[in-house]
Amino acid sequence: MPTYISLVQFTDKGIQAAKETTQRVTDWAAKVKSKGVSIKDMYWTLGHYDQVCVYEAPDDETAASVLLAADMLGNIRTRTMRAFTTSEMERILSQMP
């Protein structure tokens, strides 16, 4: 399954409810599991971003839909990247002209 990495920032609403952040992630992971999304790692961080989430989704459309739904709740803003494993990158490189 494709892997994604989201860099997460709390909104004003999200930081006001920071004590609930771990429970929100637990609840969210259970909710998106039914869409085939699996959260592999979640880190709370210092600096420009408040969290880093590593997860797998069946496809880009599913990843986008769960991110949009999360952002709509108003607690976070996300910047997301598609990540490639070594074997995926080797396949990509083998297709280069």
PLM features per residue range, with description:
Residues 1-33, 38, 46-49, 84-97:
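Short S/T/G/P-rich N-terminal loop/turn motif that feeds into the first structured element of a domain
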Residues 57-84:
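An amphipathic, aromatic/His-enriched active-site/gating alpha helix that lines ligand/cofactor pockets
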Residues 5-9, 43-66:
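Short, well-ordered beta-strand segments in beta-rich or mixed alpha/beta enzyme
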Residues 36-40, 76-78:
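A short, amphipathic edge element
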